[in-house]
C-alpha cells in the first residue's frame, strides 16, 4: 500500500512520494505515533487509519 500511496503523491504533487515523504512528520512512511504535525501528516494519518480498517486493524 505504501508504494501505491507514493505513486499517487507522485502523480498529484509531482514529487517523489517515497523520497519526499518517507520520514515526514509522525505518520508519513512506516509506522506512526503521536499527534499529526500538520495537514500533510494528518493526510498520512487518515490514510493509515483507512488502510487499517480495510485490513482489519484499527489504528487510533
Curated annotation (Swiss-Prot):
Tissue-level expression reads: Expressed by the venom gland.
Listed cofactors: Ca(2+)
Question: Keywords, A to Z?
Answer: Calcium, Cytolysis, Disulfide bond, Hemolysis, Hydrolase, Lipid degradation, Lipid metabolism, Metal-binding, Secreted
Cross-referenced Pfam families: Phospholip_A2_1 (PF00068)
Which Gene3D superfamilies does the protein's record reference? Phospholipase A2 domain
Domain of life of the native organism: Eukaryota
Its UniProt entry gives the catalysed reaction(s) as: a 1,2-diacyl-sn-glycero-3-phosphocholine + H2O = a 1-acyl-sn-glycero-3-phosphocholine + a fatty acid + H(+)
UniProt record similarity statement: Belongs to the phospholipase A2 family. Group II subfamily.
The name this protein goes by in its record: Phospholipase A2
Amino acid at each position: 500500500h505504501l508504494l501505491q500511496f507514493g505513486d499517487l503523491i507522485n502523480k498529484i504533487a509531482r514529487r517523489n512520494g517515497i523520497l519526499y515523504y518517507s520520514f515526514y512528520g509522525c505518520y508519513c512512511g512506516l509506522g506512526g505515533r503521536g499527534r499529526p504535525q500538520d495537514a500533510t501528516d494528518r493526510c498520512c494519518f487518515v490514510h493509515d487509519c483507512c488502510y487499517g480498517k480495510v485490513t482489519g486493524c484499527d489504528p487510533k
